[in-house]
UniProtKB/Swiss-Prot annotation:
InterPro entries: EVH1_PP4R3, P4R3-like_central_dom, PH-like_dom_sf, PP4R3-like. This is Uncharacterized protein C216.01c. It is found in: Nucleus. Residues 1-25, 692-718, 789-836 are annotated as: Disordered. It comes from the Eukaryota. The keyword Nucleus applies. Keywords: Nucleus. PANTHER family: ATP SYNTHASE GAMMA-RELATED, SERINE_THREONINE-PROTEIN PHOSPHATASE 4 REGULATORY SUBUNIT 3. Residues 789-799, 825-836 have a biased composition (Polar residues). One of its GO terms (biological process) is regulation of double-strand break repair. One of its GO terms (molecular function) is protein phosphatase activator activity. Gene3D superfamilies: Pleckstrin-homology domain (PH domain)/Phosphotyrosine-binding domain (PTB). It comes from Schizosaccharomyces pombe (strain 972 / ATCC 24843).
């Protein structure tokens, strides 16, 4: 009998164990299924791992943190940055509330075994990314474990405390219960599980609406304690970071205003009451230049304004990144709807921009219209690229540029600033939008002097007037940047690929052509106007700070034009005069002006040395730079460094004519700087030129036994007893042997820029076609390293480097090629695989 009873008990125990194991398996499967829905961070984040030892944080190494999900388990894994294999940390993420995010880059927690750990991220974005992964894992685990009430399993696993499973039950929303409600909410906020339960309870019971109804009564009774408690409760609800809950808080104007009123009574500042509602209800802040007839859009505009105020002022101290993201998403979708309405409502747009066509229109209304357009453009910049482009193109189509003519010529400084801000927003986004407008005007015009040219000249004239007269340094910088973008060759400013827009999509070839037309019109009608202050400059000492700021930006602009507008700048003798005038700015007592002038001279010289060097010799610019060097030789500042670098460039890259000029005209001044290594070496090179019968065209740090690719006669003279070896080197240095290397470097080989006759070898190879926007007049010293098997010589040595000007290559045909012609040629080349 006893034996039978023992057998039954044993079977019962086995059944219980089996049932428990089955429930554990079901729980694991459910958790695994929930975790599979979580998005794992796509980018490992750089992080330092710390462990607490003896009350001190010990650095355990630096690596890259990533999230990983394995079945029902989720982990933080940190791999060492040294080898990407050593695991510095692998910790299981659990649902218990043991994690905290501190400052912007720290995640700190205590493991179940009592070990304190911390992750210090290099960037706040990385910390947010991993924190969101952790929060999602905890929510997924909690949502599953709440549906299982087997206390034994939960206790054995140690995953959750049974208190987390208690059902949330708040006291009734009445004045008498506010203290109890505050304490209960505070308790539920302490764990992830209870916070989720609180969210569900508040949403299901319509608790917030019933609670908000108490606010007017509390204000009428002037019960400050209850108002403070009500504020604390609402702040806790906001911190739950639940999108539907926040949406219910701000779903309509009435409720939003109640929430703003409650948050005026912050218990952290008991003696101060904010005036949020007064600010939000001020109707003077809302102006309609053109009435908006759609009540739905009007409501969204008002709601967006209030949400922005709540985000930036009211709750900025109490919400974290997830809550900000929720508020930002509300604002973003509202703004997208508003922009869509404005973009598609032709009646509204026609009425708005017709204000600037009617001469008798009220000036105040025109000003308000400019500020309205500025706000719309600023909102559009935060939208997707395509939406923003569509809005800007629509505005330009409806004669936005006419409105900008008004704004940028206005006497009011704020109106001018708004107009320039609008223009910069558009051309910074995509200059082709403006180019296309002028091209369309040109096509529509019947007269020889097209409306496009007149309109463009008006726009550029306004920009030039602002640049010449504006006293605000910020606006000057903005207008200068606008010129660079508006007058950039397609692909030469900010984008590496000439056939790509800012969003990466393929640019229409037509956009490139109309961009070139725009630049041609600028040089025909506006270039001299822009350069006028520099061309008229006579005396620097009489200039005030405002004028000097303007000259600084002009130097930057013309430096940019000289380097980028190769085709046009070669045909303008103005640059000779400009260089002499810019050199006068070297005598200014303002360091930033001196640096701008020196940067112009140095950059232009590096871009096209042969031409710029002749200009500088004619205008004695070298002498003025030397005067500057003598002035600052004992100073320790950026001007000294920049001037010294200029002469270091001449030492290593200067032509024989330049050094001979310095020797004949400024020998004593150079000798006075002989204590500087740059000038002592420069003098040695000059002295070597006087006694060296070779007289190389390019002066550098040449050795006496160096080989030169200057022709057969020189080679025979210098190599002497090794002529055959020299011919072998020249023959090996061919297109075929250098194909792979030239592809890696992405430039033409040395032979591409040297006439075959000058190398005494036959032109047996077809010249490769060149990219359209390549600067054909500037070739840095070739940097090649041929293999020992092919030649046995390292051609990267500066002894074998040559600039195109040193070989006097006849490239007049390339000079005369217009960008449009080169664009057409390159388009066909691209089809054959040559275009970059």
């Amino acid at each position: 009998m006893d034996s039978t009873k023992e057998e039954e008990d044993l079977n019962n125990n086995i059944d219980e164990i089996s049932d428990g194991e089955n429930e554990e398996e079901e729980l694991d499967e459910a958790i695994a299924a929930a975790l599979q829905k979580i998005e794992v961070p796509s980018i490992p984040r750089r992080v330092k791992v710390y462990e607490m030892e003896d009350e001190n944080w010990v650095d355990c190494g630096t690596g890259y943190c990533d999230g990983k999900i394995e079945g029902p388990l989720a982990y933080f894994i940190v791999r060492s940055e040294a080898d990407n294999e050593t695991i510095l940390l692998k910790t299981q993420l659990i649902a218990e509330d043991i994690y905290s995010r501190q400052e912007e880059t720290l995640i700190v927690w205590q493991e179940l075994n009592g070990t304190d750990l911390a992750l210090s991220f290099q960037e706040s974005s990385g910390c947010i990314d991993m924190w969101m992964f952790l929060a999602n894992v905890q929510k997924a685990i909690s949502s599953v474990t709440r549906s299982y009430s087997n206390d034994d399993i939960l206790t054995d696993e140690g995953a959750l405390n049974e208190n987390y499973l208690n059902t949330v039950d708040l006291p009734a929303p009445e004045l008498a219960n506010l203290k109890e409600i505050e304490e209960a909410v505070y308790g539920y906020m302490q764990s992830i599980q209870s916070r989720d339960s609180l969210v569900r309870y508040v949403s299901n019971e319509n608790y917030i609406d019933r609670l908000i109804e108490l606010f007017p009564l509390c204000e009428d009774l002037e019960n400050t304690d209850d108002l403070h408690r009500l504020c604390s409760i609402i702040k806790s609800f906001v911190q739950l970071n639940d999108a539907p809950l926040l949406e219910s808080l701000f779903s309509n104007d009435e409720k939003l205003m109640c929430v703003a009123g409650i948050l005026e009574y912050d218990p952290e500042f008991p003696n101060i009451k904010a005036n949020h509602r007064e600010y939000l209800m001020d109707s003077k802040k809302f102006k309609q230049v053109v009435p908006i007839q759609d009540p739905r859009i009007l409501a969204k505009i008002h709601q967006t304004f209030k949400l922005q105020y709540l985000r930036d002022v009211v709750v900025s101290r109490i919400v974290d990144e997830p809550s900000f993201s929720v508020l930002n998403s509300f604002i973003f979708f509202n703004q997208a709807d508003i922009i869509q309405y404005l973009q598609t409502n032709e009646k509204f747009l026609h009425e708005l921009f017709s204000i600037y066509v009617n001469e008798g229109e009220d000036d105040q209304r025109k000003q308000d219209g400019i500020f309205f357009i500025q706000q719309v453009c600023n909102i559009a910049k935060g939208l997707q690229f395509q939406s923003c482009s569509a809005l800007f193109a629509t505005f330009v189509k409806f004669n936005l540029l006419k409105a900008l003519d008004y704004a940028m010529s206005h006497e009011n400084n704020s109106v001018r600033n708004a107009g320039s801000d609008i223009l910069v927003s558009i051309i910074d986004h995509e200059p082709a939008i403006v180019w296309q407008k002028f091209d369309q005007d040109r096509k529509d015009a019947s007269s020889s002097l097209s409306n496009a040219h007149v309109s463009q000249h008006s726009l550029l004239s306004n920009l030039i007037n602002i640049l010449h007269k504006e006293s605000n340094p910020g606006v000057l910088a903005q207008i200068s940047e606008a010129f660079k973008m508006l007058l950039s060759l397609p692909g030469s400013y900010a984008y590496n690929n000439p056939y790509r827009n800012a969003d990466g999509n393929v640019r229409n070839k037509t956009d490139n052509i109309i961009g070139i037309n725009f630049i041609e019109n600028f040089y025909d009608n506006s270039f001299n106007m822009l350069a006028a202050p520099l061309l008229e400059l006579e005396n620097v000492s009489s200039l005030d700070v405002k004028k000097l700021d303007m000259y600084m930006h002009l130097c930057e602009l013309f430096c940019y034009f000289f380097r980028i507008h190769d085709y046009w700048s070669r045909r303008f003798d103005t640059y000779k005069t400009l260089t002499s005038k810019v050199a006068l700015l070297l005598y200014s007592d303002r360091k930033y002006v001196v640096l701008s002038a020196l940067r112009f001279i140095r950059s232009c010289l590096a871009a096209r040395q042969s031409e710029m060097s002749l200009i500088m010799l004619e205008t004695d610019t070298y002498g003025k730079v030397l005067d500057l060097m003598l002035k600052v030789k004992d100073q320790t500042n950026l001007v000294n460094s920049a001037a010294l670098e200029f002469f270091e460039f001449l030492r290593s890259e200067g032509s024989e004519d330049t050094l001979d000029y310095l020797n004949k005209n400024y020998r004593p001044q150079l000798e006075s700087l002989n204590n500087l290594s740059t000038f002592s070496e420069l003098l040695n090179i000059i002295d070597g030129l006087s006694s060296d019968s070779r007289s190389p065209k390019t002066v550098g740090t040449h050795e006496s036994n160096s080989y030169e690719f200057d022709g057969a006669s020189n080679n025979n003279q210098r190599v002497g007893d090794d002529v055959s070896k020299d011919w072998e080197i020249q023959q090996d240095f061919s297109i075929e042997n250098d194909t792979e290397l030239s592809e890696k470097v992405g430039q033409r080989t040395v032979l591409d820029s040297i006439a075959p006759a000058e190398l005494n070898i036959e032109d047996s190879c077809e010249q490769p076609k060149q990219p359209i926007l390549e600067d054909r007049y500037f070739l840095e010293s070739a940097v090649y390293d041929t293999s020992a098997e092919s030649s046995g010589i390292n051609v990267s040595n500066t002894r074998y480097s040559k600039r195109k000007s040193d070989f006097q290559v006849d490239d007049q045909q390339a000079d005369d090629e217009s960008p449009k012609k080169r664009l057409s040629i390159d388009s066909s080349s691209a089809q054959n695989g040559y275009a970059s």
